[in-house]
Amino acid sequence: MNTQAHHVITDEHLINEALSRSVAEILPSKDGLKKELQSGRRLTFYLGIDPTANYVHLGHSTNYLILERFHALGHRIIVLIGDFTAMIGDPSDKTSMRVQLTREQVLENLQTFKAQIGKILDFNDIDNPIEFQFNSEWLSKLTFEDSVELASNFTVQQMLERDAFKKRVAAEKPLFVHEFFYP
């Protein structure tokens, strides 16, 4: 996509507001991002979500507000939908396996997500539309051979370093192989 095709706003006041309201930290640096935003180049920002429930947690709304500020400045916004990974379920901070969702359940949840985040993100901007990408577009194409090749780069010990997994092993609670595949 041509990064110069859209009008990008470089107003210092608006950029400062985007970089300071509801923002705790910017990595690698606030000054570096500010310089990029003032350059006039169209940047790409994305946020990934796994629709594992039929609602958006209120705490996530801040992320969408920040994305909308960058969108209003003319930058490209991608909402990366973890439709494939939602079927696995993020094992972080879980003391037991998440209930596995069907593809249909994930897609139903996604419709609710879109309706809720559509109240924050401007989906009606035809000059700079919000883009949706789905991780199933590439993950569902992986063959078993691809999965084995990827898995050969990691050890069980590395996987067990994750806090949630350590706790479940220590508590002698089941840990299922598919949970290791959650990125």
What is each residue range found by the language model?
Residues 63, 96-98, 150:
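A glycine- and small-aliphatic-rich helix-loop capping segment at beta-alpha/alpha-beta transitions
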Residues 88-93, 143-145:
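Short, conserved acidic/polar surface loops in the N-terminal third of protein domains
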Residues 102-103, 107-110, 114, 119-183:
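Divalent-metal (Mg2+/Mn2+/Ca2+)-assisted nucleotide/phosphate chemistry catalytic cores
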Residues 1-51:
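Non-catalytic terminal extensions that flank enzyme cores
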Residues 33-91:
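N-terminal catalytic cores of NTP/NDP-binding nucleotidyl/phosphoryl-transfer enzymes
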Residues 91-107:
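A charged helix-plus-loop insertion that forms the helical arch/lid used to bind
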